[in-house]
Amino acid sequence: MSYEDSPIIGIDWGTSSLRAWLLDSKGSVNNFYTGAHGISQIADKDFAAVLALVLGELGPKARNAPIIMCGMIGSAQGWRDAGYLQKSAGIAELAAAAIPLQDAPSVWIVPGVQSVSADGLADVMRGEETALAGVMASQKITEGLFCLPGTHSKWVVIEDSQITSLSTFMTGELFQLMRQHSILSPLMPELEQGASDEGFIQGLELAAGKLGLLHQLFAVRAGILTGQFNPVSAASILSGLAIGSEIKHISGLAQAQPTPLFLNAAGVMAHLYQTALAHFNIECQLIDGEEASRAGLYEIARQIL
């Protein structure tokens, strides 16, 4: 069957949520859906039922359109394990290694990528490789350092279109665990109306200290109890501490790069990371994270189809 003029459905299906785009044959967005249908939220692993829901939300044009998926849906806990590529970052390599679903016609899952961290340890990513490939293809980038914030933030060094280093920080997950399930939890308001820039900066300053994250986490508690920190800004302080600790430890790698850092983010996350990077004197070029994922899925689909 030829899909040359067919619309395409691209899905970034992660641990806690998914994003789906209905794209025309040129890559323009006809419809978009997002929901809290991450693989960890689907107790019976009935991924086919969730996909049917998504297709219904995207409308009649989604019927019979080929589907390209990336992210944790391709993990051992997902629909089918798509494996990992070794260091490859290009559209062609990801498309060639994408696996079809036997129980769902015209559906492919993009593999993840494995590499080594700046410390020489094994590291992996799923979903971010598609955004990275989309940026590299659309902006003709063949080298540089990329930051892809998230639950697990990724820092990727590209040389000659290949991944030479991949370092993951559990920044977002640590923030949520500490906010919801730690001794800090009772000190934080149930609902903080947006991020407090003042509190976030306090967290960044705390992260720059000498004694490290394990001490600094308790310092948030002590600071609130003694009046050093405003409890209303507690979550923002914790956010600044988590992101600041991440950037402090990667700053040497960032400052050694010949070109500005590429920050792949959008919305509040883009603002927080731009603020934190500036605090640590690191220049960055902002790239729209949602657009990057969409472009990557579209380009991979065109290679497959």
Can you describe what each PLM-predicted range is?
Residues 40-42, 114-149, 154-206:
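Glycine-rich phosphate-binding loop plus the immediately following alpha-helix
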Residues 18, 183-305:
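ATP-binding/phosphotransfer module of carbohydrate and carboxylate kinases, centering on a glycine-rich
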Residues 60-122, 160:
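Short beta-strand-loop/turn "lid" adjacent to the catalytic site in phosphate-handling enzymes
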